[in-house]
Amino acid sequence: MLTLLLAAAMSVGIASVAFAQVGLPAGFPQVFHAQLTPLNGSGASGTATLVRNGTQLTTTINSSGLTPNQPHAQHIHGMAQAISECPSLAADTNADGLINTTEGAPFYGPIAVSFTTFGDTSPASGLAVDRFPVASSVGTVNYFRSLIAPPGVAANLGNFAIVQHGVDLNGNGEYDFSAGVSDLDPSLPQEATIPANCGVINPVGH
């Protein structure tokens, strides 16, 4: 599970340590990488490269095997005071054979950054399906964006994970309600928000 420093994370002392790195000097970029592996039988995989320069984060995500012609929400998940992990099927607490976003959250954590194509990138845009990339007709997403990350995220980037969402579970070529409603927003189908892949973020060379 998400390696939370449960007692310490809420204490002033440990929180100060976690955010003491916030004053990162500009001009000294560091490269991070995430290998995205499939969840929920999606077959979706990919790579993410993140270049951090202070709080500026330039991200490239190249994925394949996603549901064609459908939007795919994608985020940095996690907490500065924790180490994110990608869930296994053991996270399926309701035994329906799927890991929904809520079931995965104890492993990878809450939304920290929304990788939208334009506009806001905060957690408030976590379900802005009209601003997330749409996969090509062959199920690829090639995403590039430079944004300003929250200081706590930028300073502790290696504690976080990237998750892409959206799986056509019944294979009809679109997101529908055949698998029920989203656990995040009942106005959306579960297919639109269920995790498709996940990868922990690591500094290049580690």
Residue ranges of predicted features:
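Bacterial N-terminal signal peptides
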Residues: 3-13
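Short hydrophobic alpha-helical membrane-anchoring segments
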Residues: 12-20
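N-terminal leader/targeting pre-sequences
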Residues: 19-206
